[in-house]
Amino acid sequence: MINGEQTMVEDELPDQGKPMSDESADIDIKDLKVGESIGSGAYGIVYRGTLFNSDVAIKKIQNEKSEKNEFIKYLKREVAVLKNIQHPNIVQFIGVYYEPLASPSLVNRLLNSSSTWIVTEYIGGGNLHERIKDTKKDFPIELRIKLSLDIALAMAYLHSRDIIFRDLKSKNILIDDSSSPIRGKVCDFGFARILNKKQQGNRHLSICGTDSIMAPELILGMEYDESVDIFSFGVVLLEMILRKKVSKVLERGPQSAFEIDQDSARQLIPDDIPVLYSDLALDCIKYQPEERPNFSHIIHVLKQLTSLFPVVHTFDNPLSPTSSPITPRKNSLNSPFTKSMRMNSFDFNLSNIVSSTSVQNNLKSQNLNFTLLNLNQINNQDLNENNNNNISNNINNINNNNNNLNDCNSNLSSSTSTIYNDSQQTIIDEDELDKEEEENRNKVNNLKEKMLLVMGEFDIYINKVGKELLLVSEEDHISQKYDECRKVIEIKKVLGEVIESDMSNSQQSNTPRKNSNVTNSRVALFLKSMERSLNEIYSSSDVLKQRIVKEDDLVESLLLARVVSKIKKIHLSSLDINN
């Protein structure tokens, strides 16, 4: 029990998810200054400090003898993950320091240290849990969506590097309010797991994390993959939507196989929450792992939402790179303000210049017979010259206008001829369009024949595979059918993407209702999942065939042909689905 939250851990495979070495990450304790405590996490206390006069966060982890094995695994996992990742939405790792015992051993400093200090960048905006809980402060939907996207980007990065986080919760999301806009950052990788792709067969992964955000398959001790992080992500989204801890408002337990009831969750969602956002959260917490979206899809949806609900960049943050708008320097000779001042500050009328007493005295001292009358005469002469020039210009303009009129008459004659020629060309173009439409209809009909032929072959395949999968009665058989199971899941996903809008009537039954009479064995859960997936494939396949028959547009038919091609590639493959 850590900080009032249950954490479950089991033994793992040897050396899996552990670092090769952490020597390169060592820091000198002399350069590190420890300040006040700012929080606590699993296995340690977090302090604010400085390293080379820069603010840092220091997690000091005590080496408890009673939990030595768990501590070593926890610590090695965190250092291994942090050392090998770098992302703008993940807290940046700086280094590690092992505090030695009274008589340190040079053989293994980790085992013979009284505590270990993990140093990361300092994020001063608190964590997401605090922001959600403090209902007195405004938490605009724009910011919730922005932070959701930040988390999703971080998780997609981790999954691309074969890392399962396994403890994604609002307390592990720090808010960086020194950037503009505010940015979310994932932290605390003590339960993260680096997958070993060379390991074949069943994955005997450990059970760990905080049970209130854990996926059902993780709690039940079944095999799991990256989709457990997607479930936890959905819980975090729900907490941001409800501004409450999900475990306190939605009941989940053994009687429901630890499912979060979708209908109950939907009833709690406020009316002002965008439907696209709430639907995404509910999709992520679906009971069956294969029904949850991946982070690529999640990011796509959240980017759509951020375009609809953008976060406004503020300029009140002195640390923000966008805090000071670029303005021209006040002493710049080329600035619009300076140019305007220069032009408006001078009067070029000579009479105004000479009318001043100082200028007249200066002229007299130089024996210049320059009077105001002379100046007025000069000004009048200039005015007359300007008027004469204007008259000449007007005469030229009249002549030009006459020439333009003659040109217009000529253009009118040529336009009449062009209109006749265009009408002839239009008739030719219409004939060509008719031919093109006929060709497109023939192409569409050919595509229909080929697609329906492929779908007929697919029906035979899926009926055969479906019967075999539903006859599974032992856990060993599940492993033997692993390839076909993955094919079923991939086919369902492909079909779901193209006919989702036509399956609205079946959306209400997406999440299975469970009761205490259901056996929660691995085989029972597998059969229920497969039966549901197969039923969705059968329905989706029928809808797809109907669309193929009805579609007359060439572009839409080509899009459907791509879907059919994907389905064929999957069921004919020897399961290289990821390519």
Curated annotation (Swiss-Prot):
Enzyme Commission number(s): 2.7.11.1
Region called Disordered, residue ranges: 1-24
Keywords: ATP-binding, Kinase, Nucleotide-binding, Serine/threonine-protein kinase, Transferase
InterPro entries in the record: Actin_reg-Ser/Thr_kinase, Kinase-like_dom_sf, Prot_kinase_dom, Protein_kinase_ATP_BS, Ser-Thr/Tyr_kinase_cat_dom
GO molecular-function terms, A-Z: ATP binding; protein kinase activity; protein serine kinase activity; protein serine/threonine kinase activity
Keyword Cell wall biogenesis/degradation: no
Domain Protein kinase stretches: 32-309
PROSITE patterns according to UniProt: PROTEIN_KINASE_ATP, PROTEIN_KINASE_DOM
Catalytic reactions on record: L-seryl-[protein] + ATP = O-phospho-L-seryl-[protein] + ADP + H(+); L-threonyl-[protein] + ATP = O-phospho-L-threonyl-[protein] + ADP + H(+)
Active-site annotation: D167
GO cellular component terms attached to this protein's record: cytoplasm
Binding site for ATP: I38, G39, S40, G41, A42, Y43, G44, I45, V46, K59
Gene Ontology biological-process annotations: signal transduction
Family stated for the protein in its record: Belongs to the protein kinase superfamily. TKL Ser/Thr protein kinase family.
Protein name: Probable serine/threonine-protein kinase kinY
Record organism: Dictyostelium discoideum
